[in-house]
């Protein structure tokens, strides 16, 4: 059973149709990279998957449960969508860290707010806080920032800030990680440190959907590659098959982007 199914997702902004019937599925532990020219709808697709945008048509399923159905208003209530959104961790192009908080506090903030909803929070506040701090330190260590827990965002490089953002997403223990061009805002020399973290997550069996222009990375780390153009899936295949020359449009695109 797929962990994620995207069924016939369409999205329009006014009269502009951005997504035109996108379907694909993802198994537990798989990594799927979504590639294609700018403007092909890749980011919009990610935002529809985790309901930051409401698809005009189609369904999103996690573990065979419909979490969004454009034809069913019951799945579109804000409270329900906020709960279902916790299936996903989302790492954006921009880091979106709170400048007034340390790296540690940025990672702890969302789970601390969630913990306050627990009926035992007042009684066990110190223990809950201590547990969350241990976990946050562990995730920062995992992304190579164990020595930066007390640093503020302005004291961190762009690559380090993006790694804090990855730790923050992991802290919520999502079933699926979504990455939207996570290196596009970085200086070239900082790109590799973020890609290494994402690759390590792939080796650990984290289920991921990655929108990226880093072609060599995508072909190295992915189980499947989805090539999008003009709001449609042109090809969904293994990296090996993509390289084989069986898909002329994909082959032309890869030549243009100088895949090694």
Where are the regions that the model predicts?
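Conserved ABC ATPase signature
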Residues: 152-156, 160
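A short, proline-enriched helix->beta-strand linker immediately N-terminal to the Walker B motif
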Residues: 171-175
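Catalytic Walker B motif of ABC-type/P-loop ATPase nucleotide-binding domains
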Residues: 177-180
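Helix N-cap at the start of a conserved alpha-helix in ABC-type nucleotide-binding domains
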Residues: 188-190
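H-loop/switch region of ABC-family ATPase nucleotide-binding domains
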Residues: 212-213
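A short, surface-exposed alpha-helical micro-motif characterized by mixed small hydrophobic
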Residues: 218-220
């Amino acid at each position: 059973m797929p962990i994620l199914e995207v069924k016939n997702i369409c999205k329009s902004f006014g009269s502009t149709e951005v997504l035109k019937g996108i379907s694909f599925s993802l198994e537990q532990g798989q990594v799927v990279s979504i590639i294609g020219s700018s403007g092909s709808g890749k980011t919009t697709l990610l935002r529809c998957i985790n309901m930051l945008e409401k698809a005009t048509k189609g369904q999103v399923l996690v573990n065979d449960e419909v979490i969004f159905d454009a034809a069913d208003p019951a799945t579109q209530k804000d409270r329900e969508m906020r709960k279902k959104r916790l299936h996903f961790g989302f790492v954006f192009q921009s880091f979106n860290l709170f400048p007034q908080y340390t790296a540690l506090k940025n990672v702890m903030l969302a789970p601390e707010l969630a913990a306050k909803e627990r009926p035992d929070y007042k009684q066990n506040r110190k223990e809950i806080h201590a547990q969350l701090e241990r976990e946050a330190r562990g995730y920062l260590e995992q992304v190579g920032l164990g020595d930066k827990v007390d640093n503020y965002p302005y004291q961190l490089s762009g690559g380090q800030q993006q790694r804090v953002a990855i730790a923050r997403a992991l802290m919520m223990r999502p079933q699926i990680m979504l990455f939207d061009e996570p290196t596009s805002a970085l200086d070239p020399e900082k790109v590799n440190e973020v890609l290494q973290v994402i690759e390590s997550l792939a080796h650990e069996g984290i289920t991921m959907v990655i929108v990226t222009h880093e072609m060599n990375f995508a072909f190295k780390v992915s189980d499947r590659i989805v090539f999008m153009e003009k709001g449609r899936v042109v090809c969904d295949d293994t990296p090996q098959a993509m390289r084989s020359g069986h898909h002329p449009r994909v082959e032309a695109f890869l030549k243009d982007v100088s895949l090694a």
